[in-house]
Amino acid sequence: MAGTGRNIVRLRQNAGLSVKDLQDIFGFATPNAIYKWQKGMAMPTVDNLIILAAIFGVTVDNIIAVNICSTVGISA
């Protein structure tokens, strides 16, 4: 999840958006969810990933970071 969080931070900054901007776009009462996404403490829902991708002008797979080795159980 940490890699996904780093991607969200990078893409948000590249888009010139603040956390407050995303909070307003999503209509969240607080920015807590966005901070949790960025810190890798939580993942956005599929719906929110699609919205993030549209905001950033990328595809969902540009946001999600997956460690293939750990996903399929391969030791490095």
Which residues does each PLM region occupy?
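Short alpha-helical DNA-recognition segment
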Residues: 16-36
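DNA major-groove recognition helix of helix-turn-helix/homeodomain DNA-binding modules
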Residues: 47-62
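Residue-level detection of the helix-turn-helix DNA-binding "recognition helix"
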Residues: 13, 27, 39, 68
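A short, Lys/Arg-rich alpha-helix, primarily the initiator
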Residues: 1-15, 25
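A short, glycine-centered helix-capping/turn motif at helix boundaries
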Residues: 15-17, 57-58
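Short, charged recognition helix plus adjacent turn
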Residues: 54, 64-76
